[in-house]
């Protein structure tokens, strides 16, 4: 899918250049002046480091901050550093079983998280994600590992997520990404695009 995505992205780039327009305008974003961004931090597994990096991100003007922590102590440290006014997301990178995720998310409800991302392994276990979502007060996000709009449709049909995160370099390129956006609207799921940090994303 990386290769297909790369070819599709290149074709869209050709269309934009032939039109003498930025690709964002070709895709219909004319008039949009600002796009909200969040600070995506490393995994530190150290409370003081988390506090320091969260405070730095806040001072730089970020109004949303994403952690990559899996331990409660670091999530608590982030909330202590940021207060209640800054939304916090946690990307866990598929570390737990369904039962482990259920238990941990239950203990994290006190932190008023914006979402928890990919809490279980394998990430395409949409049935387990749906079960966790139905029992948790914390919204769930997933999708960076999903390929094609067909897989996202299965995700939405399972009611597995609140936020879908297609990666343009994995899902099949811009064409398939747009299909995911269209399908997500039918199911009332919000799209939060994943950053394409490898594969064709290096280009």
For the regions a language model picked out, list residue spans one by one:
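N-terminal capping/lid subdomain adjacent to the active-site entrance of alpha/beta enzymes
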Residues: 1-89, 93-102, 106-110
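Adenylate-forming
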Residues: 41, 202-203
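Catalytic core of soluble alpha/beta enzymes
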Residues: 67, 72-198, 202
């Amino acid at each position: 899918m990386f290769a297909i995505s790369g070819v599709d992205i290149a074709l869209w780039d050709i269309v934009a250049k032939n039109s003498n327009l930025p690709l964002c305008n070709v895709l219909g974003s004319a008039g949009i002046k600002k796009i909200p961004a969040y600070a995506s931090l490393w995994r530190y597994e150290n409370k003081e480091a988390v506090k320091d990096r969260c405070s730095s991100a806040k001072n730089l003007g970020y109004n949303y901050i994403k952690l990559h922590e899996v331990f409660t102590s670091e999530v608590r440290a982030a909330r202590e550093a940021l207060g209640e006014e800054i939304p916090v997301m946690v990307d866990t990178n598929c570390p737990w079983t369904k039962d482990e995720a259920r238990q941990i998310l239950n203990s994290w409800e006190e932190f008023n998280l914006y979402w928890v991302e990919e809490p279980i392994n394998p990430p395409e276990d949409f049935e387990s994600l749906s079960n966790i979502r139905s029992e948790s007060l914390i919204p769930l996000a997933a999708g960076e590992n999903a390929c094609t709009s067909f897989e996202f449709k299965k995700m939405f049909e399972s009611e597995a997520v609140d936020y879908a995160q297609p990666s343009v370099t994995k899902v099949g390129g811009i064409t398939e990404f747009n299909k995911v956006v269209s399908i997500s609207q039918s199911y009332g799921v919000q799209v939060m695009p994943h950053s394409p940090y490898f594969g064709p994303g290096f280009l």
